[in-house]
Amino acid sequence: MRIIGGSFKGIKIFEAFDKNTRPLRDLVKESILNILEYSKDSKINFNNSLILDLFSGTGSFGLECISRGAAKVYFFENYNQSIEILNKNIKKLKCENKARVFNQNAFNFFENKELKNKKLDLIFLDPPYKEENIKVILENIAKLKLLKENGLIVLHRHKKTKDDFGKNYTINRSARYGISKIIFLKKIN
């Protein structure tokens, strides 16, 4: 696994090799990032952005965001081996001042006081494929008003997962890659 773009482009990062993790494939990651950087309807300016990476695993997506100029990425992961690898990756890239890692279940992210009053540009959700109840997380994001006016939520799921995003979001764009689907959500104003 490697960083695809930005200031860390080409640097190999550590990854997990066990049954408890499902790394974000480079093809899918690159497609998401290209949409975020170049599309008209789903564009994010990574420079000085604030990003929340829930179910972050070893951090490849959030680290890509830092490589492209994000001011801070908040990583939430509760699997100890993934956290260990994520911290090794952060250290390898020397981006400790731009990364904040929480050993916390992503479903409880809203309890974290460090996110209070933050306005995020992008929230990336990459839950285990068997996890279907993302609506709870989306409701908490809306309740806390975490997204900036033009902020986006990107959701990586299994293509057969039923979608229920609640009343606060609309699908801005979606795509399928093999058994994965990517959904870009915008809040309804």
Named regions from a protein language model:
Residues 1-189:
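Class I S-adenosyl-L-methionine-dependent methyltransferase catalytic core
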